[in-house]
Amino acid sequence: MNFVFTDEQLQFKETIKSFLAQECTPESIRLGWKENSPFNQKRWDDLISLGVIGSNLSEEDGGLGVDQVALTLMIEEMGYSGLPEPVAEQNFLINDLLDIFPKDIKGALIDKFDCGSKYIAV
């Protein structure tokens, strides 16, 4: 067994870490609380632009096809920063959710999830 992270996994993690250091500061989170708006739409849109939302979907389905290790590294960095947006829910549940739908509905849902107009929450 090989327990060493690949260069690609580490690069993905560092990209997320760098983004969060700039965009998910304690001040920005506190501002959301103060405004009673913990969900930051601009930050969500930026996460979509980075390909984070649905990143574990296959490339055929519009994702990056990242594996569970890279996904976990990404979510771990988001936890460190206190990111309030539902990225973990969106990414961990999307494949299982999409598997229960027929192809025609699945395609329409993928488009909505990838562009951020629909959210998965628990």
Which stretches of residues belong to each language-model region?
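Glycine-rich flavin
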Residues: 24-122
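Residue-level signal for inorganic ion chemistry
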Residues: 9, 20, 74
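Catalytic cores of phosphodiester-bond-cleaving enzymes
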Residues: 1, 21, 35
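Intrinsic disorder at enzyme termini
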Residues: 1-8
